[in-house]
């Protein structure tokens, strides 16, 4: 059993080399691992037979398609709500504001999880509720980190309707807010979905480094004071990064 475990460890060490180089020859694998050529040849032959490695016409090895299959299975089975909830609960305890998780659904955002703080205010947001991508910090944290051409196409085809007194309805101003969000790594909104409320949102990225969701804190506008904003923004950004890493972002 111990010898089998050693073989597994050595095989993993060999496979890890392909994280840094797309293809490697047998000689390169021997040089990088420091293992005997016969041992390396035996391992790569077994890994190739099982589909973990593939070999091209020149004899160089690369990761096999089985990794793509496994990777897709892992991605499909990740429940972002389940992963995010403990982080959201901790964030709520720290800032004592409502914490929300939002995901994109076409040209809208849908609230998929929410943790209430101790404040008596009950906001516009609720699980299952929708908002346009341009309005509110949480939704805009998703819009801001989409590919630029997709953002511009969205703004061009979307009528920016006022929802609250602070909703951004000017396309140029919206683009400016998006640029600021990208630069800062977070989005702030005041009275965009509901008057006298404020929110700070940050993007959550997946294993493909694409925006997968957004997390925000929201509450009374009066509680989002200028001197408190730096603390709140760092907390939201940190929570977003924690969740991103848990779903494969590197």
UniProtKB/Swiss-Prot annotation:
A biological process from GO: negative regulation of DNA-templated transcription
One Gene Ontology MF term: DNA binding
Keyword ATP-binding (UniProt): no
All copies of domain IclR-ED, residue ranges: 80-249
Inducers of expression: Induced by glucose when readily available sources of nitrogen, such as ammonia or glutamine, are scarce.
InterPro entries registered for this protein in UniProt: GAF-like_dom_sf, HTH_MetabolicPath_Reg, Tscrpt_reg_IclR_C, Tscrpt_reg_IclR_N, WH-like_DNA-bd_sf, WH_DNA-bd_sf
HTH iclR-type domain boundaries: 5-65
Keyword annotations: DNA-binding, Repressor, Transcription, Transcription regulation
DNA-binding stretch(es), residue numbering of this chain: 26-45
Function description: Transcriptional repressor of the kip gene-containing operon.
This protein's name: HTH-type transcriptional regulator KipR
């Amino acid at each position: 059993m111990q010898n089998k475990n050693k073989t597994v460890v050595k095989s993993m060490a060999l496979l890890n080399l392909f994280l840094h180089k797309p293809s490697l020859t047998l000689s390169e694998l021997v040089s990088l691992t420091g293992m005997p050529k016969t041992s390396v040849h035996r391992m790569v032959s077994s890994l190739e037979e099982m589909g973990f490695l593939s070999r091209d016409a020149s004899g160089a090895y690369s990761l096999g398609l089985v990794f793509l299959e496994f990777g897709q299975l892992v991605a499909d089975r990740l429940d972002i709500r389940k992963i995010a909830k403990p982080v959201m609960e901790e964030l709520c305890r720290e800032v004592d504001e409502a914490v929300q998780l939002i995901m994109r659904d076409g040209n809208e955002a849908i609230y998929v999880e929410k943790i209430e703080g101790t404040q008596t205010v009950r906001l516009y947001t609720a699980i299952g509720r929708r908002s346009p991508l341009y309005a509110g910090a949480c939704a805009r944290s998703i819009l801001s980190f989409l590919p630029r051409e997709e953002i511009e196409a969205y703004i061009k085809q979307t009528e920016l309707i006022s929802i609250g007194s602070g909703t951004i309805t000017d396309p140029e101003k919206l683009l400016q807010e998006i640029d600021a969000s990208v630069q800062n790594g977070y989005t702030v909104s005041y009275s965009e979905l509901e008057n006298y409320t404020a929110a700070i949102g940050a993007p959550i990225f997946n294993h493909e480094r694409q925006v997968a969701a957004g997390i925000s804190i929201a509450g009374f506008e009066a509680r989002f004071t200028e001197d408190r904003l730096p603390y709140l923004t760092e907390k939201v950004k940190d929570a977003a990064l924690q969740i991103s890493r848990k779903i494969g972002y590197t």
